[in-house]
Curated annotation (Swiss-Prot):
Protein's UniProt name: O-fucosyltransferase 29
Binding residue positions for substrate: H292, L293, R294
Biased composition annotated in UniProt, kind: Basic and acidic residues: 540-549
Top-rank lineage group of the source organism: Eukaryota
Keywords: Carbohydrate metabolism, Fucose metabolism, Glycoprotein, Glycosyltransferase, Membrane, Signal-anchor, Transferase, Transmembrane, Transmembrane helix
Record's subcellular location: Membrane
Topological type in the membrane: Single-pass type II membrane protein
Protein's organism: Arabidopsis thaliana
GO CC terms: endosome; Golgi apparatus; membrane; trans-Golgi network
Any one GO BP annotation for this protein: fucose metabolic process
Encoding gene (name): OFUT29
EC numbers on record: 2.4.1.-
Protein family per UniProt: Belongs to the glycosyltransferase GT106 family.
């Protein structure tokens, strides 16, 4: 900046002191200069001075532009750092982060994002066969829209998986509002319900079918997939889940968000049942937590972990594992140490009580068929008597949906999304999808177990006092509570950490704005350190012999 300033001062001195510019010894004003003077020297000098001034201004703008941009960047970083440093030092408010109000979802189209290519001008029709359960298929549908955009293709409404473990024959329109899906994305991608008959009749061969590698890059689609599409005009991609790279440019990431958080809307029937369950929970309690218990037989078998059920459990889970040909043999103890085992319902209850949730907290349990049934759920019920499920709250409304696991999962999705706090016992697809959505919707409190550290605590909990255990749980859960400071670029799946779609408001710290929250929090923290509020008794020890941690 010293060099720039000196250049500027020199140019000013030249303008004010040059005898040539001031007409020799006369103090003539600049507006009185004669630009068409007969004196060639004055004309030459004026041209030189103008050029020098322009050069000086260019140099100044070059340097100051960088300085200003750097200062702005450092200012933003310091503001963000001060916010995050404060959040790390303060006690954990289990119900919400007071810094969440400074962040919001933003997925608007950029100025240079071109309109969708119309059907008649596209490179062909893209058929997508999604794979897995409801939320795994959701990732595939989201990425299918982006791939269609990359290929300049017309997307046919994706087909859902009818042959996986869940055996649900629901079609797209049975779960999602298909007309809204098509219309809301009309500016991004052209979507049709089916390939036109005239196109099918004109085809000499059936649609070309292939499966792309997982995490395929944009270049892969352009180099390997696009030539097939342009040649065959109709292309089907099968087993389409996580088939697109995590790292895309910002416009494409924002398109992912528009699909996942706005275009994929459940049908009115499903949405109505889900919101009835939410209203019935709200009628009983001002706020409630939703616990997603992924403790179904398929999850336990896939994990390769031991949950204390003895030889019977090992035989049953081993039989289920045969459905996956490529699963390796795993050491259950090593998997637990690595934090790869889903928490048991009992462990989830202990974690919640240690964090500060009291036994009068209302919980909604989102789950399918729990392995071990009521016996497995009993410890969680004892820790949280206000225990509810969709079957308990909307039994009559659910009857038409009972044969369809994906539609039932959609009800759990809605209630979990609307809850004040969302907790999961695993790192599965629903956990990731909802964690990302709740971040996008304002960093609503989302608790993910730090399974690696918690597993060691659960194994040693009988060796420590409850207060010590609770303190250690709080410590190891920092960074796993859904706070904004957990947001690190490049971390995890984009569906879980949609960083390109999160914007930040200016930060200001109001110490008096959270007095009521701190009172609630201090009461909860007091209760979490009281061993009389949890069942660490001989009854618990007996249960642990059946389901050891």
């Amino acid at each position: 900046m010293g060099v720039v300033a000196e250049v500027w001062r020199s140019s000013v001195r030249l303008l004010t002191n040059s005898p040539q510019l001031n007409g020799g010894s006369h103090k003539s004003a600049l507006w009185k200069w004669r630009f068409f003077s007969a004196q060639p020297k004055r004309t030459v000098m004026w041209t030189w001075v103008c050029g020098f001034m322009l050069f000086s201004l260019g140099v100044i703008s070059l340097f100051t532009g960088h300085v200003v941009s750097h200062l702005e960047w450092y200012s933003q970083q310091l503001s963000k750092r001060s916010l995050l440093d404060m959040s790390r030092r303060e006690p954990i408010d289990v119900w919400k982060s007071k810094y969440s109000k400074f962040f919001y979802g933003c997925s608007e189209r950029g100025r240079n994002f071109l309109p969708a290519v119309q059907e008649q001008s596209s490179n062909g029709y893209l058929l997508i066969a999604a794979s897995g359960g409801l939320n795994q298929q959701r990732t595939g549908i989201t990425d299918a829209v982006v791939v269609a955009r990359i290929l300049n293709a017309t997307l046919v409404v994706p087909e859902l998986d009818h042959h996986s473990y869940w055996k649900d024959d629901s079609d797209f329109s049975d779960i999602f509002d298909v007309n809204w899906f098509i219309s809301s994305l009309a500016k991004d991608v052209t979507i049709v319900k089916r390939v036109p008959d005239r196109v099918m009749r004109a085809m000499e061969k059936p649609p070309y079918t292939t499966r792309v590698p997982r995490k395929s890059t944009l270049e892969y689609y352009l180099d390997q997939v696009l030539p097939i599409l342009t040649r065959r005009h109709v292309l089907q991609l099968t087993k389409f889940d996580y088939r697109l790279a995590n790292d895309l440019d910002e416009d494409m990431q924002k398109l992912r968000c528009r699909v996942n958080y706005h275009a994929l809307r459940f049908t009115k029937r499903i949405q109505s049942v889900g919101m009835k369950v939410v209203k019935r929970m709200r009628k009983m309690a001002k706020r409630f937590i939703a616990v997603h218990l992924r403790f179904e037989p398929d999850m336990l078998a896939f994990s390769g972990c031991d949950f204390g059920g003895g030889e019977k459990e090992r035989a049953e889970l081993a039989e289920i594992r045969k459905r996956w040909d490529t699963l390796p043999d795993l050491d259950p103890l090593e998997e637990r140490k690595r934090g790869k085992c889903p928490l048991t319902p009992h462990e989830v209850g202990l974690m919640l009580r240690a964090l500060g949730f009291t036994n009068d907290t209302y919980i909604y349990v989102a789950s399918g068929e729990i392995y071990g049934g009521e016996k497995t759920l009993k410890p969680l019920r004892e820790l949280f008597p206000n225990f509810y499920t969709k079957e308990m709250l909307a039994n009559d409304e659910l009857k038409p949906l009972l044969p369809y696991s994906s539609r039932l999962a959609a009800i759990d999705y809605i209630v979990s999304d609307e809850s004040d706090v969302f907790i999961t016992n695993n790192n599965g697809n629903m956990a990731k999808i909802l964690a990302g959505r709740r971040r996008y919707m304002g960093h609503k409190r989302t608790i993910r177990p730090n399974a690696k550290k918690l597993s060691a605590l659960f194994m040693d909990r009988e060796k420590m006092e409850w207060q010590t255990f609770a303190k250690k749980v709080k410590s190891c859960q920092r960074g796993f509570m859904g706070d904004p400071d957990e947001f690190k670029p490049g971390r995890g799946e984009f569906h879980e950490y949609p960083q390109s779609c999160i914007c930040q408001r200016p930060f200001s710290y109001d110490k008096t704005s959270t007095d009521d929250e701190e009172e609630d929090m201090s009461e909860e923290n007091h209760n979490s350190t009281s061993p009389g509020h949890v069942h660490l008794s001989s009854a618990d020890n007996e249960r642990d012999e059946v389901f050891p941690d």
